[in-house]
Design a protein with these regions (language model features):
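Hydrophobic/aromatic-enriched cytosolic interaction surfaces used to assemble or bind macromolecules
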Residues: 1-189
Length: 189
């Protein structure tokens, strides 16, 4: 009997830039939050970060958070479940119908949530120009993905609490601003 060959998962590292500092946060092997702050004036940020990362994990992806005010979003509650192709078609249809911007100038993503009666489709879009400007702020560090700030903060609260509470108001504040997110059974405000 052989040992199953597991595909090595990439370590996701959240990155936030505030003035001349880059803040990195990730979960270690015990699912405990680890973080470090590095000054962007330092040479080769990655080599400064590497000693703090788990030794087993040589692959990582950097995820930056983008403010919701730079994005467009819409939530649909649908009567039936959609597959990935149908979700993408629905997103393209909604974006073409509701935004005065050509699809080739947008980046979009969606999140699906099965409901007791139906299906929730959360669509988020951003102008490529805005996304690229945001990515440039982090250079020479290359981000793998941009995530919505409110989603990132909610996941952080969930990690701290160890569960996903319902009907809860979360408040977050830092030097760049404040954010209030209310998570209810079938909606997020």
């Amino acid at each position: 009997m052989g040992i199953a060959n597991r595909k090595q998962q990439k370590l996701q590292i959240g990155v936030s830039k505030q003035q001349d500092n880059l803040y990195f946060v990730w979960l270690d092997e015990l699912h405990k939050v680890q973080s470090i702050c590095l000054n962007t004036q330092q040479k080769d940020i990655f080599s400064q970060l590497l000693p703090h990362l788990p030794q087993k994990n040589s692959q990582c992806c950097f995820v930056g958070a983008i403010s919701p005010h730079l994005t467009w979003s819409k939530t649909l509650i649908l009567p039936q479940t959609l597959n990935a192709q149908e979700c993408e078609q629905q997103c393209r249809f909604i974006l073409q119908k509701e935004l005065p911007i050509p699809l080739d100038e947008l980046w979009f993503d969606y999140l699906t949530t099965p409901l007791k009666q139906g299906f929730r489709l959360d669509i988020t879009a951003i102008r490529q120009e805005s996304a690229n400007a945001e990515l440039e702020k982090y250079l020479p560090l290359k981000l793998t993905a941009l995530d919505l700030l409110n989603h990132s903060i909610l996941r952080a609260f969930y990690a701290i609490l160890g569960q996903e509470p319902i009907n809860t108001l979360f408040l977050y504040q830092d030097q760049q601003g404040c954010l209030a997110v209310c998570e209810r059974l079938q909606q997020r405000q």
